[in-house]
Curated annotation (Swiss-Prot):
Organism: Synechocystis sp. (strain ATCC 27184 / PCC 6803 / Kazusa)
Protein name, as recorded: Ycf51-like protein
Domain of life: Bacteria
InterPro entries named among the record's database cross-references: Uncharacterised_Ycf51
Family: Belongs to the ycf51 family.
Length: 170
């Protein structure tokens, strides 16, 4: 959604109400103080639309990623996502890149002194009836400080991926 059209017209309306307010004070119209309220409201509305436009970032999609859910987020630098049990190694890698792009925010901070956001992908397997085992399939590491640095380091846990393949075959 492109909010620049709404922002432009809201700014025009704000400028027009400001001009009417100034004219009302110059000519001492009776409703001049109401125009102060209208102008103030329009200014706040325009600033709000501008802020809304800043918050809407288009997130690029990574080819080959699968649907995932965020199951843990400390609000700083650690995130855990859940992926389907049918996922492959290439899908885990693409999904970790997608999650690193989706959850990057300049408002995140480091809690352990490292300026890195860590995203871990996990799935749940059932090796026996009544037993659930979480498998951490890999991690993505991305720097917290800058948005331009899109170098994402992916580390896959090959042992966990082999165990997942054995579980899928069974």
């Amino acid at each position: 959604m492109d909010v620049t059209i709404y922002l432009r017209w809201s700014a025009y309306a704000t400028i027009a109400s400001f001009i009417f307010m100034v004219l009302a004070f110059v000519f001492r119209w009776g409703f001049r103080f109401r125009l102060v309220g209208v102008t103030s409201f329009m200014t706040v509305l325009t600033i709000g639309i501008f802020g809304l436009g800043l918050g809407m970032f288009d997130r690029p999609t990574v080819e080959g990623s699968v649907k995932f859910n965020r199951v843990y987020d400390n609000g700083a630098n650690q995130i855990v996502i859940s992926v389907p049990v049918t996922v492959s190694a290439t899908e885990v890698e693409a999904t970790l890149k997608q999650a690193a792009n989706n959850y990057f925010s300049l408002g995140r901070i480091s809690t352990d002194g490292k300026e890195q956001m860590v995203i871990r992908a996990r799935t749940l397997i059932h090796p026996q009836p009544g037993l659930t085992k979480p498998l951490y399939l890999g991690s993505a590491y991305r720097t917290l400080g800058t948005k331009e640095n899109d170098q994402i380091e992916i580390k896959l846990d090959r042992k966990a991926l082999r165990e997942l393949e054995r579980n899928q075959a069974a």
